[in-house]
């Protein structure tokens, strides 16, 4: 798996929980205070586990959870986080 380019992350402001957990991004160069982490819900798993694991991981680096929600059919989970430092 390849790293997520900083320009793409800054443009989209959204990253998958999988990318966070795989270490495919460097948030030290992320220019904004807020970011959205996503995870898919599917058959046999809720999606909350990888989403919350990613949020917990980012909490170690100065980010905090703002809110968790779903939009539309509910198959995609979204966690809004913000940089505290």
Residue positions per predicted region:
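Terminus-proximal functional modules
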Residues: 1-85
